[in-house]
């Protein structure tokens, strides 16, 4: 079809969607129907819908068809942190904080200001961090069941940066990475910028379908597996020991790198050992202090096999040179005096209290989650569209996430993810009531 006819069709459909002439939720003609109606080749009709999907105007749903999306939702929802209105209750992003943390920071900064090595913190630091600070993080990791020497710990600018340096140091564009079909959006974002191919693995209970994973490894040259075995985001599962051992066996059999994300692992009480303990020779363990202490610190860490450390150091040098010494010194002092352990314990209690509140307020709504996590996954009935629920809640001054940012496959389930850790309990109760009401109203439509 000549481009003069092809582009105007895309423009016309886009205009109809943006103007509301084709309202959100409208089922569009099938590819064959569109081709017949417009006199197109089937491949051209497919291209029309692909362009509309790239513009964020439609979504193709396997087995259901192509639907008009809610355009009121901002792009990259739950990946990009936007400045919210003062009266907006944010259930899309987790940045848990406890009363009194600001005073802890004041005290710690005064102590740091009086320390003897303050001038040293104003200089450039080693790319992987000062050895003293790395040793403190290694000590912290012992509480997670992971024993590594300080030389194998690298300090980074938050766990997100830890993921980035791992992918940049160990993988090449075009490499295949196995991931959960629903996973942390930040990983997907970095993988896209590095031009990696994500191969989604469906869930099977509390973890990925390992039969499907092994089949993938037999058929494709899988370079890495990214997983959150302890407090998966967004589903909250904690893999049991046999499943972890089976996952490790697959990685070893096929020579695959394991990338273990432990961002929320501190919330689990007595979890099985990390994958990095079970397979230290092929596992990179990534976590940070944003969730267990405060998001504004932006201090994370990577524990990696020794042969990979120098590659990662070079990437740290290329991206940030070093993590700010003042921040790493602050974290080290809080590890040393027990503040981190205390805050983690208090946040475990806080997360469980918020989960109990969610159970009480959400009532009979189907949900998936862990009693100790800071998030809840709400699968919706087949006739309910998640984007319409999300827009309705935005009008009620409540921000939530749909499944779209978490999905790594073409099949995007209609579901809502709630982040419970960022608002005061009273505001959370009111917001959860609005969520329940919005879902029930759309279910009854």
Residue ranges and their predicted role:
Residues 1-113, 122, 317-324, 345-353, ...:
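N-terminal basic, amphipathic alpha-helical segments
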Residues 23, 59, 284, 400-401:
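Short beta-strand(s) of the beta-wing in winged-helix/HTH DNA-binding folds
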Residues 63, 149-150, 369-375:
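Short Gly/Ser/Thr- and Asp/Glu-enriched loop/turn motifs at secondary-structure junctions
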Residues 120-254, 265-284, 441-443:
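Conserved core of the PLP fold type I
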Residues 262:
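Walker B catalytic acidic pair
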Residues 285-370:
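PLP-dependent aminotransferase class I/II
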Residues 303, 377-379, 419-421:
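Short hydrophobic/aromatic beta-strand micro-patches
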